[in-house]
Amino acid sequence: MKVSIIGTGKIGTDLLYKLIKIPEYEIVAFVGRRDINKSIPTNVTYYSNGIKFFIDNPKSCDIVFDCTDAYSARENAKVFRNQGIYTIDLTPSKIGRLCVPNINCDCLHNIDNVNMITCGGQVSLPLLKYLKSKCNISYAEVVSQISSDTAGMATRINIDKYIETTESAIQTLIGVNNCKVILNVNPSPKTVMQTTIFIKTNQKVIFEDYDLFIKKTQNYINGYTSDVRPVYIKDNIVMVSVKVYGSEDYLSKYAGNLDVINCAAIEVSKKIFDIRNDKVDNHKNIYEIILDV
């Protein structure tokens, strides 16, 4: 399958180093908007003319990973749609269908643009789905912390969209309408990505299979690690916390926030690859087993 990446910042470059490990994928182009000032694999071709590359080379790939920013992605999507290129959008643009691999990969049929929400969304939504399978949730608060070293220009541009899109995904995919999302950027370069969730519930339950949930989520996010198991800090409030370590393909282990969205995007691309090769049942979400829902 022919794939391209537009956006050559930290997410795009880390994604590139992950994709070159997949033998079924041919990387057609790594596309930015300025001269490249970093080393990239010699077998990858870099283009500095941005979206114009795709305009000048229509239908050059089957899938494009958009790693730009939420505002650029909106304009890029028009070009990709006109050319019939499947877009996996790693910005919080909320243009395409919101998707988390172990929640709703069945949405990938009959669409041409899928949105990977945010790094915090990819960490918190599987956990919220697990919690909701155990108890009702009247309110959810998601607090994520990342290192400032992993927050590139596009991340800083997207802060408001990050919050808006993550909250929208919680409401849409989890069904918790009353929610709040907070993102803290820690100045320390050695800050592991951490997401802490607080939920309000009127049920007392035991989360006996929590370790199994963590293990199954690690099937595609290797660095997804339990920090604090679900615990009642008040009669009606449960707290749980996870950390995500980067796989160090290109970035450090402290870039778990970038690693998680790239891993999720690759998992989605593999699903699309299978769909195009008729390897899956079009009516079955094969990821349901991960959350046992």
Task: Label every model-predicted segment.
Residues M1-V143:
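N-terminal Rossmann-like NAD(P) cofactor-binding subdomain of oxidoreductases
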Residues R34, I146-D149, Y287:
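Short, conserved aromatic-histidine micro-motifs
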Residues V238-S241:
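A generic structural motif
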Residues K279-L291:
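Short, highly charged C-terminal tails/helix-capping segments
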